Amino acid sequence: MDNDKHLKGTTTVGIVCSDGVVLATEKRATMGNFIASKTAKKIYQIDDLVGMTTAGSVGDAQQLVRMISVESKLYKMRRQESITIKGLTTLLSNILGGQRYFPLMVQLLVGGVDKNGPAIFSLDAMGGNIEETKAVATGSGSPMAYGVLEDRYHEGINVDEGMELAVRALYNAMKRDSASGNGIDVVKITADGYKRIETGEVDKILENLK
């Protein structure tokens, strides 16, 4: 099948903070050189305090979201507690690894807060699973995003600072990567809850960058 005929999501960012994590994505989905969607959803809530970002094939990513959301709910029903983020990503890694001959074309970030504190893991299409200790980006705009993240990340960053940094990183990626654009979604997760940031608040941050 022609790979250009698949819907693809692009740039995502994750930042580990002192008091939680920040996950952020832009909203464009492409099909080859065609902008197929300007409102693509790329951040999904998997558990009360866990989110997942997706880059790559939209269909493959949505399949994984459905699978892992169900597994997370089943774990909670059986154990009366949430699965750890490391446990969740190990399960995802096993699913992806089992598909290695017919790979699901995705890059994933799974982040949140559990009994071990804030954490973000990145996963590739083959099931490679890395715990990120600072900041991470995936997708076609990640080289530009990394330039900002490497320059501005600092130890002890809090979620409000992390939110501003994530928006700045995506803003720079969107300026140079034609497959990224059409606005930014941001989620911050702390021990107090999972919060999707209002568009107006994101727009205020963007205005200060221009």
UniProtKB/Swiss-Prot annotation:
Keywords: Autocatalytic cleavage, Cytoplasm, Hydrolase, Protease, Proteasome, Threonine protease, Zymogen. GO terms for cellular component: cytoplasm; proteasome core complex, beta-subunit complex. Its EC number is 3.4.25.1. GO terms for biological process: proteasomal protein catabolic process. Its main location: cytoplasm. It catalyses: Cleavage of peptide bonds with very broad specificity. The active site is at 10 (nucleophile). The formation of the proteasomal ATPase PAN-20S proteasome complex, via the docking of the C-termini of PAN into the intersubunit pockets in the alpha-rings, triggers opening of the gate for substrate entry. Interconversion between the open-gate and close-gate conformations leads to a dynamic regulation of the 20S proteasome proteolysis activity. The keyword Cytoplasm applies. One of its GO terms (molecular function) is threonine-type endopeptidase activity. The keyword Hydrolase applies. It is found in: Cytoplasm. Residues 1-9 form a propeptide. Component of the proteasome core, a large protease complex with broad specificity involved in protein degradation. The 20S proteasome core is composed of 14 alpha and 14 beta subunits that assemble into four stacked heptameric rings, resulting in a barrel-shaped structure. The two inner rings, each composed of seven catalytic beta subunits, are sandwiched by two outer rings, each composed of seven alpha subunits. The catalytic chamber with the active sites is on the inside of the barrel. Has a gated structure, the ends of the cylinder being occluded by the N-termini of the alpha-subunits. Is capped at one or both ends by the proteasome regulatory ATPase, PAN. Belongs to the peptidase T1B family. This is Proteasome subunit beta.
